């Protein structure tokens, strides 16, 4: 694993260094201008870049800004990107930890962001590595998006919340308290609200009265979308129905569980009052 150097951007050069990586990851149509990034940085926001040894180009970056949610300050992490050769290297976690340190210094308790709920790799990182959770679903949040990751489908998102000072977060970042395999949840009889039927999404279960629920998603959504856009849309709509129903009935997704054969599913539990941070130590 390469040792990355994390540099916090304080000037226009640092912010401008993110542009090529933004274009490679999404497209030139969705680039955040470095001038705007710099203004955000000088008003409580955060930009950090990760560099691999002997490579002057950034291997990844993270960008976020201050916001208010439910009358409390929090940090919104708008972008996180890592170049292909460095994905799975630990750089994404290093960038998130740098962002976390910045926010803790500001007295911020929650870092939040949106993510596509059907992206299994991102789910494993956000829920498994970081210890985040979600209880909010947004239909077509960004509208039609022209970039290569999102074009052709409604831009549905879950709103991910990361309690950066929570003991569970510390444990996850240290590699402790890792989620159990999906097979364990299945052997315990935890019910699926949504389960795959081959490559296709099955129908929703009739009841959500269980104490725990599973919502399965495709193993590799981008590959599925490239192969069969109509099937990808079926998954988008099925996932939408499952999450909206579960969240509407008081559940929150607190884990992403993986099986040895590559299957993956969110674990949902009943959530406490809306104004409380979820305590998921028991999961």
Model-based region annotation:
Residues 4-84, 257-259:
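A conserved beta-strand-loop-helix scaffold within acyl/acetyltransferase catalytic domains
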Residues 38-49, 153-155, 248-254, 262-266:
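A short helix-loop-beta-strand connector motif used in the catalytic cores of GNAT acetyltransferases and
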Residues 86, 90-98:
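Conserved acetyl-CoA pyrophosphate-binding loop and the N-cap/start of the following alpha-helix
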Residues 103-116:
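Conserved GNAT acetyl-CoA-binding A-motif
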Residues 114, 124, 131-150, 255-258:
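Conserved catalytic-core motifs of GNAT/GCN5-like acyltransferases
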Residues 141-173, 268-278:
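C-terminal "cap" of GNAT-fold acetyltransferases
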Residues 162-226:
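A conserved mid-domain beta-alpha-beta active-site/ligand-binding segment of alpha/beta enzyme cores
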Residues 199-283:
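Charged, low-complexity intrinsically disordered regulatory/assembly segments
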């Amino acid at each position: 694993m390469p040792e990355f150097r994390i540099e916090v951007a304080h000037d226009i050069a640092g912010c401008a260094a993110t542009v090529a990586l933004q274009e490679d990851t999404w497209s030139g149509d969705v680039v955040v201008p470095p001038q705007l990034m710099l203004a955000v940085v000088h008003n409580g926001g955060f930009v950090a870049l990760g560099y691999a040894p002997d490579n002057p180009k950034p291997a990844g970056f993270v960008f976020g800004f201050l916001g208010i949610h439910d009358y409390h300050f929090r940090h919104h992490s708008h972008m996180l990107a890592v170049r292909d050769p460095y994905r799975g290297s630990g750089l994404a976690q290093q960038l998130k930890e740098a962002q976390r340190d910045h926010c803790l210094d500001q007295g911020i308790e929650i870092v939040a962001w949106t993510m596509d709920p059907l992206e299994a790799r991102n789910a494993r990182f956000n829920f498994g590595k970081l210890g985040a959770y979600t209880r909010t679903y947004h239909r077509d949040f960004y509208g039609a998006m022209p970039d290569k990751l999102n074009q052709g489908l409604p831009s549905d998102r879950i709103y991910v919340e990361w309690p950066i000072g929570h003991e569970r977060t510390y444990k996850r970042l240290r590699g402790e308290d890792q989620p159990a395999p999906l097979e364990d949840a299945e052997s315990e009889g935890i019910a699926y609200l949504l389960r795959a039927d081959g490559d296709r999404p099955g129908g929703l279960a009739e009841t959500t009265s269980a104490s725990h629920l599973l919502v399965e998603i495709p193993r590799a959504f981008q590959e599925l979308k490239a192969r069969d856009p109509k099937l990808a849309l079926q998954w988008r709509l099925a996932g939408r129905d499952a999450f909206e129903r579960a969240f509407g009935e008081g559940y929150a997704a607190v884990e992403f569980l993986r099986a040895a054969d590559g299957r993956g599913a969110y674990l949902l539990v009943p959530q406490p009052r809306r104004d409380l941070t979820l305590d998921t130590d028991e999961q």
